[in-house]
From Swiss-Prot:
Belongs to the HFCD (homooligomeric flavin containing Cys decarboxylase) superfamily. GO terms for biological process: coenzyme A biosynthetic process. Substrate binds at residue 140. The active site is at 173 (proton donor). Its EC number is 4.1.1.36. The gene is PPCDC. It comes from Homo sapiens. Keywords: Coenzyme A biosynthesis, Decarboxylase, Flavoprotein, FMN, Lyase. Pfam families: Flavoprotein. One of its GO terms (molecular function) is phosphopantothenoylcysteine decarboxylase activity. One of its GO terms (cellular component) is cytosol. This is Phosphopantothenoylcysteine decarboxylase.
Length: 204
């Protein structure tokens, strides 16, 4: 995938694939990234790419991700001089929808505060708010129940972003309660719903 090759607004949907950019952060739910990407690729007419934080890399193998995978190093390797492309801007132009799954507590706090210190948060800070952005919170129950979490989630919603709520279950740490990322099937169904609402996109 070469995001700089074409501008999404320049080509009708019927002539090209719909571009979904998946952001993945450092929650243990990042273990589900290979399954999530696989299920998204099952939707006809979708092209998928992934932006990862460095901490998220701990939870999956790049060999299990069958699409282009971008990380912080790519931002700086691509840009050498003033005329070179800026990756986070090219990615926000390329993508028709941004799905952040999982969105950990750290990145939630950064985005709510406007901090952009890695490739993913730069994409989110530069995001075109006329395009859908979906986020899937995932964190320990104690972190989820902290009062600041609700404030930060509300802030993202105020930006126009769509929450795919976390669920209650036994977490990897052994605690039981709210904070687990929504199931992959739920996430994929929501992506389909939003694609249809925003573009009239239909599976062939």
């Amino acid at each position: 995938m070469e995001p700089k090759a074409s501008c999404p607004a320049a080509a009708p949907l019927m002539e090209r694939k719909f571009h979904v950019l998946v952001g993945v952060t450092g929650s243990v739910a990042a273990l589900k990234l290979p399954l999530l990407v696989s299920k998204l690729l099952d939707i006809p007419g979708l092209e998928v790419a992934v932006v990862t934080t460095e901490r998220a890399k701990h939870f999956y193998s790049p060999q299990d991700i069958p699409v282009t995978l971008y990380s912080d190093a790519d931002e700086w390797e691509i840009w050498k001089s003033r005329s070179d492309p800026v990756l986070h801007i090219d990615l926000r132009r390329w993508a028709d929808l941004l799905l952040v799954a999982p969105l950990d507590a750290n990145t939630l706090g950064k985005v709510a505060s406007g901090i952009c210190d890695n490739l993913l948060t730069c994409v989110m800070r530069a995001w075109d708010r006329s395009k859908p952005l979906l986020f899937c919170p995932a964190m320990n129950t104690a972190m989820w129940e902290h009062p600041i979490t609700a404030q930060q989630v509300d802030q993202l919603k105020a930006f126009g972003y769509v929450e795919i709520p976390c669920v209650a279950k036994k977490l990897v740490c052994g605690d039981e309660g709210l904070g687990a990322m929504a199931e992959v099937g739920t996430i994929v169904d929501k992506v389909k719903e939003v694609l249809f609402q925003h573009s009239g996109f239909q599976q062939s």
